A protein has these predicted regions:
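Specificity-determining recognition surfaces
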Residues: 45-48, 55, 138-170
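A short beta-sheet element
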Residues: 42, 58-60, 70-140
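Short beta-strand/loop turn elements enriched in aromatics
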Residues: 49-67
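A short glycine-rich beta-alpha junction/loop motif
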Residues: 9, 114-122, 133, 153-176
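Short amphipathic coiled-coil heptad-repeat segments
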Residues: 1-22, 194-207
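Hydrophobic structural patches
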Residues: 14-18, 180-192
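Short, well-ordered beta-strand elements within core beta-sheets of diverse protein domains
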Residues: 16-18, 79-80, 122-127, 167-172
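Non-catalytic DNA-recognition/assembly elements of restriction-modification systems
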Residues: 14-40, 167
């Protein structure tokens, strides 16, 4: 087993699945993505939203590691066609890039496939060298969250630009190790979500 100093030298975490060995690759997020970009709010704002059609994802729909779809908006086919460049695909990584929720990230699910995003949500579409779920989880780590905060230099409104997002420092293991890490974190998140729902039910009974 590698010592603490050896782990630092090899650029690997101090806790690791025992069957994996070797150094993790250092790279920038831009090297792992085929798309980094956001959308825009349709002309007319809320007035153009419909009750069905293409999902329109806003920053309030992106939680930390999960989507919040109870108040999802919709746009019609005509509006969608005007924003075709921001069409969502399943497993796109969604990142909030402005305001108080900056840094929150979640994976696009089948439920919002074919939808669009506004200007406050960035789409990160990974290439075949990295698992989208791994990138989504990695952005949630304290390392990247602190990096995001370090990029905010005053002003009345926080924000990330695409160049800054592409500069995120990412350490990646083999795809096999990425998948195992992502599965473990997904299981943990599911249990946290279950416990949160139980707490909400108990609190509603107490009121």
């Amino acid at each position: 087993m590698a010592t603490y100093k050896e782990q630092n030298k090899l650029n690997v975490p101090h806790l690791r699945f025992p069957e994996f060995h070797g150094e993790w690759e250092k790279c920038k997020l831009g090297e792992l993505a085929v798309k980094v970009g956001s959308g825009s709010t349709p002309k007319g704002g809320n007035a153009v939203y419909t009750t069905s059609g293409h999902c329109f994802v806003r920053s309030q729909n992106v939680g930390m590691g999960h989507l919040i779809l109870n108040d999802i908006a919709y746009i019609d086919e005509s509006t969608h066609q005007k924003q075709k460049s921001t069409e969502l695909r399943t497993n796109d990584v969604l990142l909030n890039i402005t305001g108080a929720s900056i840094g929150r990230t979640a994976l696009a699910t089948e439920e919002i496939n074919g939808g669009n995003v506004n200007q406050h949500v960035c789409i990160i579409r990974t290439n075949g060298n990295v698992e989208p779920s791994y990138i989504c989880d990695y952005i949630q780590t304290s390392k990247i969250q602190k990096y995001i905060q370090s990029l905010q230099t005053g002003g009345s409104r926080e924000g990330l630009n695409f160049e800054q997002i592409r500069s995120f420092p990412i350490n990646i293991p083999t795809v096999e190790e990425q998948v195992k890490i992502a599965k473990l974190l997904s299981l943990i998140n599911e249990r946290i979500a279950t416990q949160s729902k139980l707490i909400e039910k108990l609190e509603s009974l107490i009121k």
